[in-house]
A protein has these predicted regions:
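N-terminal targeting leaders
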Residues: 1-50
Length: 50
């Protein structure tokens, strides 16, 4: 698997960094992060592996 996601949090802001295999995985990771209690904002810096 080429998926590697690093998650950082600070005061309700979640930053997603790393690589995923598809645009769908990128969107899914963002949706999961948004669904976590206390999360106010998600910064999605995930790159899709080509």
């Amino acid at each position: 698997s080429l998926t590697r996601i690093d998650v950082d949090t600070n005061a309700g802001v979640v930053s997603l960094n790393g690589t995923v295999e598809s645009p769908e995985q990128r969107a899914q990771a963002e949706q999961i992060a948004k669904g976590v209690g206390g999360v106010k904002r998600v910064i999605n810096n995930l790159q899709v592996q080509r």
